Amino acid sequence: MKRLLSLIFLVFVFFAVMLTPPALAGDAAAGKTVFTAKCAQCHLGGKNLVNPAKTLSKADLEANGMASLDAIITQVTNGKAAMPAFGKLLTAEQIENVATYVLAQAEADWK
């Protein structure tokens, strides 16, 4: 009986860990400050004034392969298409914070 309870407990812990969303690495509050100063001109409220089909909504990020911290960091750092590179304008920490903020806002549907 003790083994069965131990097994059930371990299975429960395993699934609890596996179903917990990963913590975001950066500081979303600091990212909001940078986003407001550097990104909101084109991406206010998660929109995209240059290419309205590629917003910062969770669905669009997923559809465009951008729903990860690494993908957003890479695009902000290097730029892509009409989006300029910010790698020389922002520190790596600022870029990570912006990416964290964008993912958090996408999860909250930019509310």
Swiss-Prot record:
Transmembrane segments: none annotated. PANTHER family: CYTOCHROME C6, CHLOROPLASTIC. Monomer. One of its GO terms (molecular function) is heme binding. Pfam families: Cytochrome_CBB3. Its main location: other. This is Cytochrome c6. Belongs to the cytochrome c family. PetJ subfamily. The gene is petJ. Residues 1-25 form the signal peptide. SUPFAM superfamilies: Cytochrome c (SSF46626). NCBIfam families: Cytc6PetJCyano. GO terms for biological process: photosynthesis. Functions as an electron carrier between membrane-bound cytochrome b6-f and photosystem I in oxygenic photosynthesis. One of its GO terms (cellular component) is plasma membrane-derived thylakoid lumen. Keywords: Electron transport, Heme, Iron, Metal-binding, Photosynthesis, Signal, Thylakoid, Transport. Heme c binds at residues 39, 42-43, 83. It comes from the Bacteria. It is found in: Cellular thylakoid lumen. Binds 1 heme c group covalently per subunit. Disulfide bonds: none annotated.
